[in-house]
Amino acid sequence: MIKLIILLFLVFLMLSCDSSNHIRTYHLPKIHHTNNETLQTKSQKPQLSGFTWEKPGSWIPSQGSSMRIASFDVPFSTGMGDLSVMELGGEGGGLVANVNRWRGQIGLEPLEESEIRAQAQPGESEVGPYQIFQFINDSNSDAAMLAAIFPMNNSTLYIKLTASKDGIMDLEKDFKTFCSSIKRNTNN
């Protein structure tokens, strides 16, 4: 009986050893982009999700989350910032909730609505008026942000630039120019 158990164990052991658990490598052909695709990537006026804009030539289109309409790596004198463009339905959570969430992301305490409204800088673009907010964490010079909120009929457009304090100071003018250039794409 013991010989049968040992024999069954050895058979089981040999059958369970399979080469399919080894690492496999595959070679895939490289995807070549046409000239037209390359030009669209470098376009100064992208037409994504119903909006167009003009960006500074130094801004580099980048991968962002699936929620973003667009993402850019934004170089400045001592580093790189991250700019995101997002559109959310309705009020997208509301002014107070969004501003206080952004403040929390850089280590700042929440504010009351009256304080938030007092800090808003007005702006104007072809899609309508918007508000810009500047957040700088004085205890952490690497934590700063510019954010713009564009309320529209059925949605809200958000543009957010995160960088260091120096980056925000360097990029503020370009950020405001970018926000003012936002237009609805009439080809949609």
Set out the residue ranges of the language-model regions.
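Flanking scaffold residues of small Cys/His-coordinated metal-binding clusters
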Residues: 9
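Short, Gly/Ser/Thr-enriched beta-strand-loop segments that form substrate-interacting elements
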Residues: 126-144
